[in-house]
Amino acid sequence: MRARPTLFIAPLFPLLIVGTSVDRPVQTVSQPSDVTLTVVVTGASTEGGTIGASLYSTADGFPGQVAKAAQTSARPRTAPVDSFVFRGLAPGPYAVSVYHDLNGNGKLDTNLFGVPKEPWGTSAKVRPRLRAPRFEEGTLNVTASTRVEIRVER
């Protein structure tokens, strides 16, 4: 009677699993990054209200869903030029949206069709008329500390 090869291999199967799991690289906890993105906001015509900026690391939520942003910041507008610094960024693609909340209600007001009634801007190089800019159009490849200027307009 011939011995089956599967009977010989079967007892070694648990060793194969253990061997492959030991060979995997150990994941380490990432250290905080010193990469920053400075966003300079220009073009707001009046002082007053609130100026806000949101940083997105994925297309999900860009440009208008602040709750899905990786980082966000807003403050009363008191100077002709505002800037925001986003710190501790992992190198990679990001997109930024900014708005000038003129009436201070905490959001970008839009008309019946969803078109903004208050000044806004993004890191996108295009400003589509019938849709919001896409994440891919506004992607900044941040690998070191970077500065970008975004103009807000109606």
Residue ranges: model-predicted function:
Residues 1-11:
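Bacterial N-terminal signal peptides that target proteins for export
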Residues 9-19:
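Bacterial N-terminal signal peptides
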Residues 35-43, 53, 150:
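A short, amphipathic beta-strand motif
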Residues 52-56, 97:
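Beta-strand signatures of extracellular beta-sandwich domains
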Residues 80-84, 136-138, 146-148:
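Short strand-edge motifs at loop-to-beta-strand transitions and within beta-strands
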Residues 86-89:
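Short, flexible loop/turn segments at beta-strand junctions in immunoglobulin-like
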Residues 92-98:
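A short tyrosine-centered beta-strand micro-motif
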Residues 102-110:
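Acidic, glycine-anchored loop motifs typical of Ca2+
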